[in-house]
Amino acid sequence: MAKDEKKAALDAALKKIEKNFGKGAVMRMGEKADTQISTVPTGSLALDAAIGVGGYPRGRIIEVYGPESSGKTTVALHAVAEVQKRGGTAAYIDAENAMDPAYAEALGVDIDSLILSQPNTGEEGLQIADTLISSGAIDIVVVDSVAALVPRAEIEGEMGDAHVGLQARLMSQALRKLSGTISKTKTIAIFINQIREKVGVMFGNPETTPGGRALKFYSTVRLEVRRAEQIKQSGDVLGNRVKIKVVKNKVAPPFKVAEVDIMYGKGISQSGELLDMAADKDIIDKAGSWYSYKSDRIGQGRENAKKYLEEHPDIYQKVQEQVRQAYGIDEKSIADRENPEKIKEKREETSEENKTDNSEKTK
């Protein structure tokens, strides 16, 4: 077949595919307009840097897992707050029935506009998530947690009944359906997960996450959250030093670690992580226990230096700008990648497609 004939045959095939499956079903890679990754900040500057693209990528699945009381829900709620600050809509599927509105509000979440669901079964929770995402009106949905998405058969059965692999099959089926919709609507889907231990493992890591392997495969970013040490002052425990490891990353190099302070009742200490990041890049000098900025001492000891930054917003802002530039996560580049108008147009297109599909099914 000659070159011109091949081109004509390919064009005819592409037109046929577009006619049958709709515009955009197939395209040349160079034709795609939104080649850059659109992101939303995580609420932690250190985590933005660790993920490598300045925040959570839109239209992707994120898994946040770790031991109990390590800070998983706090990490997710900070993401919800960041989305709402930018005028987005957030949904929270509280399968654990443990949502604390007062704590969420302290982290900056607008609880009046937050869409909350406390489903009775795993099927109900995932169906609600699917319906919300398919609407094209949700910017972020958090499922807390995968381990609490109990299949209906287990809820209705007797205590002690064996339901081998039921939750894994449920998650596998749900993610097959959700992944495409999440991508089209540019929704960030955060799945919080717990840790279990495999029985009889002698060598290697015995820890695993419930819900089967599907979530591991479909996740673009997987974050492991672990407590490192307690933060104490004058004998009182104020919070925990937490390590967030990027164990999987499809948008940037993985295995980077963000260390943050999670303070009781306040969430992630942004002044603390800013101080650490600035000290690492020599923006703030550290000599012994003293911290200095441009030859001016700002505090003896980490907690005093943090307090100084919080009490001097002008210096805080200057240091933050320098840190963003040093780590390549300045807000302008993130805003350029987000391109809100394109995201809005894409959502409207998806919403119209869903309406058309539903009307055709009704006929």
Curated annotation (Swiss-Prot):
List where Basic and acidic residues composition bias occurs.
329-363
> Does the record carry Cytoplasm as a key word?
yes
Indicate whether Nucleotide-binding appears among the record's keywords: yes
- InterPro entries named among the record's database cross-references: AAA+_ATPase, DNA_recomb/repair_RecA, DNA_recomb/repair_RecA_CS, P-loop_NTPase, RecA-like_C, RecA-like_N, RecA_ATP-bd, RecA_C_sf
Q: Name one GO cellular component term.
A: cytosol
Q: Where is this region: Disordered?
A: 327-363
Give an example GO molecular function.
single-stranded DNA binding
List locations, semicolon-separated: Cytoplasm
A Gene Ontology BP annotation from the UniProt entry: DNA repair
Sites where the protein binds ATP: 66-73
Question: What UniProt keywords are attached to this protein's entry?
Answer: ATP-binding, Cytoplasm, DNA damage, DNA recombination, DNA repair, DNA-binding, Nucleotide-binding, SOS response
Report the domain of life of the source organism.
Bacteria
Give a short account of what the protein does: Can catalyze the hydrolysis of ATP in the presence of single-stranded DNA, the ATP-dependent uptake of single-stranded DNA by duplex DNA, and the ATP-dependent hybridization of homologous single-stranded DNAs. It interacts with LexA causing its activation and leading to its autocatalytic cleavage.
NCBIfam families assigned = tigrfam_recA
Similarity remark? Belongs to the RecA family.
UniProt-recorded name of the protein: Protein RecA
What organism does this protein naturally occur in? Answer: Lactobacillus acidophilus (strain ATCC 700396 / NCK56 / N2 / NCFM)
Q: What is the lineage of its organism?
A: Bacteria, Bacillati, Bacillota, Bacilli, Lactobacillales
